A protein has these predicted regions:
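Nucleotide/phosphate-binding site architecture used for ATP/NTP-dependent chemistry
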Residues: 1-146, 173-323
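Short C-lobe core helix of eukaryotic-like protein kinase catalytic domains
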Residues: 148-152
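Protein kinase catalytic-loop region centered on the HRD/HxD motif
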Residues: 153-158
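A short glycine-rich, hydrophobically flanked beta-strand micro-motif that places a catalytic Asp/Glu
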Residues: 159-172
Length: 323
């Protein structure tokens, strides 16, 4: 909605701008809190992705944010509880366009588009599968490998969680096959584990100072809710039409994760800390909070609420498979 791309110069920097529209949990402004730290965070992540063997092998890419700017409103900044949206109306983030990282035979596809259907109610994912020449299960397995494995590895080894909803994930596609993932948005959509991980030592202090830190049992929901619930949950019903039942969908995901973990036995303690196979997962909700959060008068963004836990589909299909 608010990212502008250079139409005349392919590969030029995108610019992200504030937009006074209430979408999901907040008005989409540019907070000044992360402006100075954003470029430092993206440079650190790019270094990690360029030197970590697993991430290099995955081909995953961090879309850098080389610069950002923000101007505060003197009047609203002086008020203790001024609505936050009035303090986030003048800012900009420059971000690398995915085309900068694509190979000549690749094309960029937002993962959110995999939830879409055409006018005949045919899933777009099905068109990519047909073009790939792969069967649906093989195609899904490849999708999980290039998207979920890098996200989970970043979390377990470095204690860094990215809220990887469908707009933050770009797939590099080649003849309908997902090749690798391009990740973006580190100003507010990146969080750190509360525990001290030595792999995080090189993260600039300026980034640490403005980045939220959560215990492992809450940080894991950035992957479970941020990706499994908000993205995969909407793709899986479409895959049923293509011959992949929902349980089989999650069996394939579980198999990809299990294969990754078997290849990294030295990280077993981290896998236990960030377990994706517990019987239940946190249920994070936004819509009910919208009805009660004093957004018009408050100076802060809405916080999610937690309801009764949900059964974990990865645990369910693993139990069925083992039995």
């Amino acid at each position: 909605l608010r990212t502008l791309t250079n139409a005349s110069r392919r590969g030029g920097l995108d610019i992200k701008l504030p937009l006074t529209i209430y979408n999901t949990s907040c008005y989409r402004g540019i907070p000044g809190r992360y402006i100075a730290a954003g470029p430092l965070a993206s440079r650190w992540l790019q270094q990690v992705f360029a030197t970590d063997a697993t991430l290099v092998q995955s081909g995953a890419v961090i879309l850098g944010e080389p610069a950002a700017g923000y101007v505060s409103h003197e009047g609203y900044a002086a008020l203790a509880r001024a609505p936050y949206r009035y303090q986030e109306m003048l800012g900009v983030i420059w971000r690398e366009n995915p085309c900068r990282w694509l190979k000549p035979d690749e094309s960029p596809v937002l993962m959110a588009t995999l939830m879409e259907c055409d006018e005949n109610n045919q899933p777009l994912a099905g068109a990519y599968i047909d073009r790939s020449g792969l069967d649906a299960e093989t195609w899904l397995t490849q999708l999980f490998r290039v998207v979920v494995v890098p996200l989970y590895h970043l979390l377990c080894r470095y204690g860094v969680a990215l809220i990887a909803h469908g707009q933050n994930i770009t797939l590099a596609m080649k003849e309908g096959v997902p090749q690798r993932v391009l990740l973006k948005d580190f100003q507010g959509d990146m969080r750190l584990v509360k525990e001290e991980f030595p792999e995080m030592d090189s993260l600039p202090q300026e980034v640490r100072d403005v980045t939220s830190r959560l215990s492992a049992d809450y940080l894991i929901h950035d992957l479970q809710t941020g990706h499994f619930v908000t993205v995969l949950r909407f793709i899986s019903p479409l895959m049923v039409r293509l011959g992949v039942p929902e349980r089989r969908f999650y069996q394939l995901l579980a198999a990809v994760l299990s294969d990754y973990m078997k290849k990294h036995p030295q990280m077993s303690e981290r896998f236990a800390l960030f377990s994706l196979f517990r019987p239940q997962i946190i249920r994070v909700v936004l819509n009910p909070v919208k009805l009660t959060w004093p957004d018009l008068d408050g100076g802060s963004r809405m916080l999610p609420n937690y309801l009764e836990d949900l059964q974990n589909p990865l645990w369910l299909v693993t139990q069925e498979y083992e039995s």
